[in-house]
Amino acid sequence: MSQWISRFPIPKIYLSFLLLWLYYAIFSASFLALLGFVFLLVCLFFHFPWKIVTKVLLVCGLFGSWFLFQKWQQEKASHHLVNSVATVRILPDTIKVNGDSLSFRGKAEGRLFHVYYKLESESEKEEFQQLTNLFDVTLEGKLSIPQEAKNFSGFDYRNYLKTQGIYQTLTISKIHSMKEASSWDIGENLSSLRRKAVVWIKRNFPAPMSNYMTGLLLGHLDSDFEEMNELYSSLGIIHLFALSGMQVGFFMNAFKKFFLRLGMSQENLKWLVYPFSLVYSGLTGFSASVIRSLLQKLLAQHGFKGLDNFTLTVLVLFIVMPNFFLTAGGVLSCAYAFILTMTGEEVAGIKGLVRESFIISLGILPILSFYFSEFQPWSILLTFVFSFLFDMVLLPLLSMLFCLSWIYPITQFNFLFEWLENIIRYVSQLSTRPFVFGQPNLWVLVCLLVSLALIYDYRKNLKKAPLLILFIVLLFLVTKHPLENEITVLDMEQGRSVFLRDMTGKTILLDVGEKLAVEKKEAWQEKVTSSVAKRSLIPYLKSRGVAKIDQLVLTDSEPKQLDHLLEISKAFNLGEILVTEETLSKRESMDKLNESNLKVRPIKTGEQLFIFGSSLEVIENQNSDSKASIAMYGKLLNQTFLVTGNIEEKFLNKSYPKIQADVVLTHQQVSKKKTDVEVFEIFQPKITVISVDKKKKFKEKNGENNQELGNSIYKTDQKGAIRFKGWGAWQIETVR
């Protein structure tokens, strides 16, 4: 087979690119991917004779059939869902305990489910924290379909679980019994073995040492590592915990040296590496980067090097892990490997390593922008420094301590990890915010990647490079500063947030959502959570290239917005914060704002916020119950907008009886006592957008149809985020 592969009539890297376009054309139903595949086929016809083209088309047909079969299986599984589940087998290494919340992945009826359960007692929590074996759980629960993305460029939980082979989630209401089980399934036994290793480390080593040991050896990070996780992410070096080539190489070399010392021949060792690779991949949770790296190592021992090695790895991944390239981890892992393969031969000495680090950072930048919308320039230097520390010092040290722990746990090195975390905190304080590039669309992404590839090709003849560099800069600028106006109402689960930006780059943010109310709990029930602002608002703004918010307006004095506001201030530069007089009178809130050195001033009736070549005017700043709240009105492009804040419509109508609006942006709390029709008869808008709180329902009279009033109603709980876009007139689009 290796001879057939080596004699393939076209460059194998060309074949892998051809199949990659075909892969995305089928799995993503992307017109751009189909266009790219056809373009490469046309190039193939021009550069190779018919006989060779026929062989390539045959290979494309075989892989295309495999892709279509996998796609069909996924669609079939997503449509033929089960109605109930009575027994689930726990996969131990997927257990996550966060306060009184338990989640894990379980098998039932040949399907995989993501399972949630609210723990009832501290003893039950400890039982699951120490659980390491396979158990069959008899239960009562409710099945549901995972949630789709709620905001533009937001995390699509349903699609993510789909790439993991999961199509339903299960929420347990009651556990009847748990029975220990045995299995011949290799994956299940490796899951149990990995869990045993994690629990052993947690039991015998203190934090933070235990977190680094589970992270670097097993690819497992607990919720108690959340703070450091955020710091590593903000510095752009969280990938140090993503097990990849360096870790795989370390353990593979250690394994080979051990058996060679025992006298095993190279030929026999070559085949013994296969079961080792299976066990090691299972112990790391079948991580995408580990599997990719292991495949490259296995192919290398059969003589495949460089681009041939990378190409065959991609082809094998198409077969054994069909969803690999649908995940961010899979794409980034292969992108890094490809860049390393292309530049690896040119590295020589420290200068070469620095050059390689720069080239990798530049080459991966478009893909990082696509997934994360930002880039931390400090990561180039920090990766260079900390990679050496993690891979050359911590990894061997932790491996040795883990092995010795079965004889006697040595915990005296914990101070090193405490020092490391203090250094990370200090560096985080010194570092600047990441550069926000925005999320390029697929067309821009492809243009960026092609342009960078051309620059690499012209690296020895740089006459054409300036034009390509200028083109790349323009693409990044268009992504960061879209040449369009927008008004976006985000789905914030609690409260609301409206983002406005015009073609000149002027930005206004109305409200930031509210912190979800949390019941007071005992210490064992407290859990680490991330705010809605971090999950929804901040990622969206960064995806649109926003680094500065010129004006942030809090339309009411609700203190629940304060926590979100402080998080926004850490992520973006804030020009000024406009609040009600009542907010200024709240000493506790103002003290927190002053500590953050934020510019805060009151907003008054009659004040205008200029944007879109026009303005929004504050027409009211007090509700019927004398509570401070702001309503704004103005003509933006071709339509008049009314933003009601928390002011009741009837109260507003008494003050402005002749007011009419084409578009009303309101919050559910405003109209919670009214039906849809009663609310919209007041202003008779053409379009009404309602921000609906997650745990509330908006009333609607039976038999009444809002369309009869000529009013289109968009609710965030049904449509997700709603966005108005345009140059001279508004076009509306929704997430769902």
Each model region followed by its residue ranges:
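N-terminal leader/targeting segments
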Residues: 1-77, 292, 445, 733-735
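Membrane-interface helix/helix-cap signal primarily in integral membrane proteins
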Residues: 2-5, 63-239, 535-539, 548, ...
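Conformational gate/switch positions in structured elements
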Residues: 9-11, 245, 286, 330, ...
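Alpha-helix C-terminal capping segments
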Residues: 24-27, 42-46, 105-108, 198-205, ...
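Hydrophobic alpha-helical transmembrane segments in multi-pass membrane proteins
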Residues: 29-50, 54-60, 170, 228-382, ...
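Non-globular, low-confidence helical/coil segments that flank catalytic cores
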Residues: 128, 133, 137-142, 182, ...
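Alpha-helical transmembrane segments of multi-pass integral membrane proteins
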Residues: 341-440
